[in-house]
């Protein structure tokens, strides 16, 4: 039988902070089923590996017998979380929120156990809140407390606007914990303020305060900025297995250790042993293969993980071109499109500056020919096979815009 201390040690793995750890240990010792909450605003349709840092920790709680409250912030999502933002965020429409929420429900059970997961929508209690309820909720916090939050403080000091609804967001997120009577809440490090608001509100409403666990923000494929679809440095959990495998094989050796800690279910003792082996001369590529196969198997199956590994070996050791090259259509004027912009719009690079750097390094080929001209314009009407590095390919077609066609 696993002891409360052993459970705590496992839960602590990969976390940034556990507030308060002694309280969590006490609740584990009580042996009751904990209600473990994590909220996701469905502001984008696809979950990526960055989201699974939280999902994996939720799954860990489930494996120890606890219940997960997967909160879809369909109400708060229409406000938009201001955390880390230096400008007011544009709210999403209700229809877009619901469309994204449906895809979340389809994707989360690739990680979570559906038998131990309660999916809830915060519109269930927030849509019925009256003006009096909102005023009562707002009375539990002050503007001074809100300005303690770093992003609000910087905007205030810089005389940049802060909308009233942005002050409401942490209160509404915190009230979710009251409505759900959460014992534990998980969130990214950028969510710490909001999670603490939840603790404060639970106390104000006469409830036992939740334990807070913050998780690191996962770096994207570039190893610098956080994983984000908008930055193009992400791995979506619904992507084809070959794409997931190839992207993981492309990460740096340093980033590989970070991904192993936050994404892998391998014991830390095993990962530590691998580190020592690499220090003694073992090839880190072999460990990267293990990581890539594990992640593909998680979102597909073991057989598919073996298949994409074999395909990867064939492609990059024998110089084979992948069979399923993505087809990209770009609309441009008669002057065409600059090659650096084409690479970015085809999602082959994260930015035009990265495009220019890779061209300079000789890492870009068009129709098999290495490109050296950074200012090349690609004209409409022709389809090209574009390659960046060893494993990124796209079949790109440039089409004239309708306005240009009429001229």
UniProtKB/Swiss-Prot annotation:
The gene is tyrS. InterPro entries: aa-tRNA-synth_I_CS, aa-tRNA-synth_Ic, Rossmann-like_a/b/a_fold, S4_RNA-bd_sf, Tyr-tRNA-ligase, Tyr-tRNA-ligase_bac-type, Tyr-tRNA-ligase_bac_2. It comes from Nitrosococcus oceani (strain ATCC 19707 / BCRC 17464 / JCM 30415 / NCIMB 11848 / C-107). Gene3D superfamilies: HUPs (3.40.50.620), RNA-binding S4 domain (3.10.290.10), Tyrosyl-Transfer RNA Synthetase (1.10.240.10). GO terms for cellular component: cytosol. Catalyzes the attachment of tyrosine to tRNA(Tyr) in a two-step reaction: tyrosine is first activated by ATP to form Tyr-AMP and then transferred to the acceptor end of tRNA(Tyr). A motif ('HIGH' region) lies at residues 42-51. Residues 337-398 form the S4 RNA-binding domain. Belongs to the class-I aminoacyl-tRNA synthetase family. TyrS type 2 subfamily. ATP binds at residue 229. Keywords: Aminoacyl-tRNA synthetase, ATP-binding, Cytoplasm, Ligase, Nucleotide-binding, Protein biosynthesis, RNA-binding. It is found in: Cytoplasm. One of its GO terms (molecular function) is RNA binding. One of its GO terms (biological process) is tyrosyl-tRNA aminoacylation. This is Tyrosine--tRNA ligase. Homodimer.
């Amino acid at each position: 039988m696993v002891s409360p201390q052993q459970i705590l040690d496992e839960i602590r793995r990969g976390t940034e902070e556990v507030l308060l750890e002694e309280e969590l240990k006490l609740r584990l010792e009580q042996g009751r089923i904990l209600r473990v909450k994590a909220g996701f605003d469905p502001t984008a349709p696809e979950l990526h590996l960055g989201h699974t840092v939280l999902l994996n920790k939720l799954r860990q709680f489930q494996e120890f017998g606890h219940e997960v409250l997967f909160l879809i912030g369909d109400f708060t999502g229409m406000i938009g979380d201001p955390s880390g933002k230096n400008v007011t965020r544009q709210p999403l429409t209700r229809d877009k929120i619901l469309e994204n929420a449906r895809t979340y429900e389809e994707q989360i059970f690739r990680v979570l156990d559906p038998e131990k997961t309660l999916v809830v929508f915060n519109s269930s209690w927030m849509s019925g809140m009256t003006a009096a309820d909102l005023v009562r909720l707002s009375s539990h916090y002050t503007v001074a407390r809100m300005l303690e939050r770093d992003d609000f403080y910087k905007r205030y000091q810089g005389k940049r606007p802060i909308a009233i609804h942005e002050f409401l967001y942490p209160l509404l997120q915190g009230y979710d914990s009251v409505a759900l009577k959460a014992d534990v809440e998980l969130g990214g490090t950028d969510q710490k303020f909001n999670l603490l608001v939840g603790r404060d509100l639970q106390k104000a409403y006469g409830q036992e305060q939740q334990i807070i666990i913050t998780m690191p923000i996962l770096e994207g494929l570039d190893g610098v900025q956080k994983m984000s679809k908008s930055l193009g440095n992400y791995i979506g959990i619904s992507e084809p297995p070959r794409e997931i495998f190839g992207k993981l094989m492309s990460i740096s050796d340093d980033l590989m250790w970070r991904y192993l800690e936050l994404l892998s279910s391998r014991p830390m003792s095993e990962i530590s042993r691998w580190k020592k082996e690499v220090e003694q001369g073992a090839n880190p590529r072999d460990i990267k293969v293990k990581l890539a196969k594990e992640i593909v198997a998680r979102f597909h199956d073991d057989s598919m993980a073996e298949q994409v590994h074999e395909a990867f070996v064939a492609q990059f050791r024998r110089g084979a071109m992948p069979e399923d090259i993505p087809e990209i259509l770009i609309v441009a004027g008669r002057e065409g499109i600059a090659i650096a912009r084409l690479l970015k719009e085809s999602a082959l690079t994260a930015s035009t500056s990265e495009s220019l750097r890779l061209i300079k390094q000789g890492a870009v080929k068009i129709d098999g020919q290495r490109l050296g001209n950074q200012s090349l314009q690609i004209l409409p009407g022709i389809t090209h096979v574009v390659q960046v590095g060893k494993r990124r390919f796209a079949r790109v077609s440039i089409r004239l815009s309708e306005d240009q066609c009429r001229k």
